[in-house]
From Swiss-Prot:
PTM summary: Ubiquitinated, leading to its degradation by the proteasome. Phosphorylation at Ser-60 reduces transactivation capacity. Phosphorylation at Ser-283 reduces transactivation capacity and also increases ubiquitin-dependent proteasome degradation.
Domain of life: Eukaryota
DNA-binding region: 185-244
Source taxonomy: Eukaryota, Metazoa, Chordata, Craniata, Vertebrata
Name used for this protein in its record: Homeobox protein CDX-2
Organism: Mesocricetus auratus (Golden hamster)
Amino acid sequence: MYVSYLLDKDVSMYPSSVRHSGGLNLAPQNFVSPPQYPDYGGYHVAAAAAAAANLDSAQSPGPSWSTAYGAPLREDWNGYPPGGAAAANAVAHGLNGGSPAAAMGYSSPADYHAHHHPHHHPHHPAAAPSCASGLLQTLNPGPPGPAATGAAEQLSPSGQRRNLCEWMRKPAQPSLGSQVKTRTKDKYRVVYTDHQRLELEKEFHYSRYITIRRKAELAATLGLSERQVKIWFQNRRAKERKINKKKLQQQQQQQQQQQLASPPPQPSQPQPGSLRSVPEPLSPVSSLQGSVPGSVPGVLGPAGGVLNPTVTQ
């Protein structure tokens, strides 16, 4: 042993006086040689216990303590349960080659399971490690270790891995298709029967805005509430406005398409041969003379004779 090797060395390495150089004036110091301890193999548990008892008695205060402070009470050693002695005996038994668990009366986990759990229950308390392993897998998304996999396989009665703590797992992100919701699914919706819709359409065709009295009568007749009848009329008017707006847009689009398809008409240019000369207007005297056949230039007299316009000389 290393300890015995140091003890068996020559004591000459610890001289009685310290050698010093001539330049330093140091007083000689005497060292006492260490006692010769027996070999380490000679120790026994009983000897170790006796040495510990002697050390405790040496450290315990005697009557030399002053009365002003009083002897300290070792209550901290008495605060432990009586099981401490059993633990010390178990340690001693383990040093001698035995098992400390056997000396203290503990049994193996298999014996404990055989004595205390003779029947197999489906809801076994040992499912807690599976829950803990599932929680650790949730917090740490890395690959599970072989120990956790083995524990999960042993806890499953059918041999398949099954996690008993599904409610502790983080829910997976749903797909985009499941996240899309329509407007009517999130709200309260009334499904009208064919007879109710027919009567409501008749009333809407008669009057787009229903009166309070007619609304109460129609609700009592169809088995609906007045609020439901009012909401149906509001939705029906909105639907009609939407339909009319769509029709107007379609008409405008058709007109635009027709204008783009047919080019605008171009003005026709006159041809040079088609132009004709316009006759000049005639005077009334010339027209009158031309209308009388064989007329002689002159003026008719009162007796019906013709007067010569020329003056005779």
